[in-house]
Amino acid sequence: MKKILTVFFIFVFALFCTAAEKPRWTGQPIYVYVPEYGNMSVLMKQAFTAWQTKSRSLVRFKFVSSPSNANIVVEFVDFVGNCYDVNAVGCTEMETRGGQYYKSYVTIGTKEYVRRYEGGRSVRELRTRSKEHIYGVMLHEAGHAIGLGHSEYAKSIMFPYDLESMQYLTDEDMRLLYKKYH
């Protein structure tokens, strides 16, 4: 009897330790709130859908109309403030409960300053980021929202630099996702 109890407690302990080391979303679909913000909303939904499609529904999303019903809440702002001591275009914060993800907050900065020359002088102009300047960031932040960290592989959307040239998910991104959810 002692051996059975010992094996049982070791099993339960290992189960809890594994969960604590590997937080992830346990319920599917993951409910996502994306506020109406013109083309930015469309692109953000496309970013989540790209993860679902490329992963063959390993992660699934359902878009909801209220942040109170969502696991992942997206917010659009002109500029992201300080994100973990880094000036960023996007930022994701995760909350865990019982060792698993409970809530995620994704903030996307929609504006950028562009310098142009007018009458021989430099003028700073505020404009909305184009798809080329924001979609890679949205894919990257959606990856963080499902629990992925940064990758050291430069051709991964989870690589923290050069997101302007990255507009798609790669096999490396899927490797990271499968490692997290299998």
Describe the predicted segments one by one.
Residues I4-F13:
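Sec-dependent N-terminal signal peptides
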Residues A142-I157:
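Catalytic Zn2+-binding segment of zinc metalloproteases
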Residues E21-K45:
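Fold-level signature of zinc-dependent metallopeptidase catalytic domains
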Residues I30-Y31, V106-T107, E112-R115, A154-Q167:
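Surface-exposed aromatic
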Residues L15-A19:
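Sec/Tat signal peptide C-region and signal peptidase I cleavage site
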